């Protein structure tokens, strides 16, 4: 855990009060949601509330982290995004592709763990570094629509230099302004305020943005016309928020299975303790291990291995040796663990039996998605819809920034409601197996509509050099055959 994560709770306590005063707003994020986000984050970091080494011997296997990783992997499988139509579209495509290629799975995993994160253009013209990823404790919601869409938000940025704390509050919201004719117009406003403090528990005094070199190029107030959506995208889980029905924020994928995750850790810990305590021990009467010396004293004559113990009491002359063979309840433990895993699968939106403890290998595994796993497929598809919605909103925000930075206007197909999502987004079919994909690709290759090179690389495992060598050899054989060589002269 880094420094800022350690002081996060302290910062948020004063951040709410001070930021509300600075911008004359009220946050609509409830304490219940903030506390839940903290709890979910602790769980996926391996510190769930039910683990206390001082009071119990429960250890966590952090199944919640695995659940988020597995789900993000399935949801983002082979994800690609194509934004086309103009020079501007090409720039936007580079920004989105950089995110998809390097970060999207990790960010979806974060979203699944804490309920939602914000994707926000930062004003950079570098496509590889244009998008910021904001966790829930680094923003506060000020306004929402009746549909639950976020309309206003304050973001907090932090710097620590020479033991001095610097904070920048960035407030995004819609307001109104009158044009020359006196008509009211909607305006998107971004306000930036900087603060300097010697303490981590207050914003301190207000300073100018240019007092901090990293923020010197940022305008204090920016007004943008003709904006219909916020210039950020909220990537949230597609689950109903029953913790706070009025909140626009999402909930963790495992929020409804906390007790089952606790039960799983208990069951796994008991299984581990049982294995640890299962060592075969042989008890031998100590009289049989010693000899009587002068004066009637008895001295030890044998150095015992770790699996042999001497015992003064409990053994008589007729039973010099006693065997202790601990009972292993492995089968019962595994049955119990699989029962818990089945309930976790159900309560997290997966088909029963999606996660099992393999009796042969002793490993926790996820079963292959089959055609009858309707719950799993529906959950993954719902998550994919959330991803597409967030990416479309992010594309919209980047397009507005293109206007601000003078990038030539042009058609962007991803912003055209008449363009189907299938033309913009591609996800791997959950129900298609590798063999099915290879068979389909092979048939298309035979028909001449699928690249031979692509087929050999994706489905036969050859690299470009090997494919080049194969094509060259094939071309040489064809040339020799046409010229009468390659046994043709015989």
Which residues are covered by each model-predicted region?
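A glycine-biased, small/acidic residue-tolerant capping/turn segment at secondary-structure junctions
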Residues: 393-422, 467-470
């Amino acid at each position: 855990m880094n420094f800022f994560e350690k002081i996060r709770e302290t910062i948020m306590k004063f951040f709410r009060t001070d930021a509300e005063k600075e911008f004359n707003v009220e946050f609509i994020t409830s304490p219940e949601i903030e506390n839940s986000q903290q709890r979910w984050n602790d769980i996926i970091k391996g510190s769930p509330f039910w683990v206390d080494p001082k009071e119990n011997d429960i250890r966590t296997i952090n199944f919640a982290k695995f659940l988020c990783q597995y789900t993000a992997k399935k949801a983002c499988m082979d994800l690609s995004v194509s934004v086309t139509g103009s020079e501007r579209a090409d720039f936007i495509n580079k920004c989105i592709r950089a995110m998809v290629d390097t970060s999207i799975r990790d960010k979806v995993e974060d979203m699944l763990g804490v309920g939602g994160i914000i994707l926000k253009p930062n004003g950079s013209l570098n496509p590889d570094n244009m998008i910021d990823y904001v966790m829930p404790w680094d923003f506060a919601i000020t306004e929402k629509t009746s549909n639950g869409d976020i309309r206003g938000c304050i973001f907090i940025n932090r710097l620590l230099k020479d033991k001095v704390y610097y904070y920048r509050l960035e407030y995004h919201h819609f307001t109104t302004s009158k044009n020359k004719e006196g008509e009211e117009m909607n305006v998107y406003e971004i306000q930036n305020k900087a603060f300097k403090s010697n303490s981590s528990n207050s914003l301190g005094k207000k300073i100018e943005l240019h007092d901090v070199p990293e923020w010197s190029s940022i305008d204090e107030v920016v007004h943008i016309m003709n904006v219909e959506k916020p210039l950020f995208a909220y990537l949230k889980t597609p689950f109903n928020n029953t913790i706070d029905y009025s909140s626009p924020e999402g909930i963790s994928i495992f929020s409804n299975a906390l007790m089952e995750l606790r039960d799983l850790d208990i069951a796994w810990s008991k299984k581990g303790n049982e294995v640890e305590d299962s060592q075969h021990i042989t008890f031998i009467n100590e009289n049989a291990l010693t000899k009587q010396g002068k004066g009637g004293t008895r001295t030890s004559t044998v150095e015992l291995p770790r699996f042999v113990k001497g015992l003064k009491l409990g053994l008589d002359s007729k039973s010099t040796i006693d065997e202790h063979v601990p009972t292993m309840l492995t089968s019962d433990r595994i049955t119990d663990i699989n029962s818990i895993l089945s309930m976790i699968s159900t309560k997290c939106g997966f088909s029963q039996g999606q996660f099992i403890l393999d009796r042969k290998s002793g490993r926790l595994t996820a079963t292959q998605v089959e055609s009858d796993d309707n719950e799993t497929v529906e959950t993954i598809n719902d998550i994919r819809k959330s991803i597409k919605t967030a990416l479309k909103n992010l594309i919209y925000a980047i397009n507005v920034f293109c206007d601000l930075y003078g990038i030539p206007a042009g058609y962007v197909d991803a912003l055209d409601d008449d363009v189907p999502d299938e033309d913009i987004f591609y996800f791997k079919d959950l129900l298609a197996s590798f063999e099915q994909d290879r068979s389909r690709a092979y048939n298309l290759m035979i028909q001449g509509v699928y690249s031979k090179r692509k087929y050999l690389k994706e489905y036969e495992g050859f690299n470009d050099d090997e494919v080049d060598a194969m094509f060259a050899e094939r071309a040489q054989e064809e040339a020799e055959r046409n010229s009468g060589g390659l046994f043709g002269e015989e």
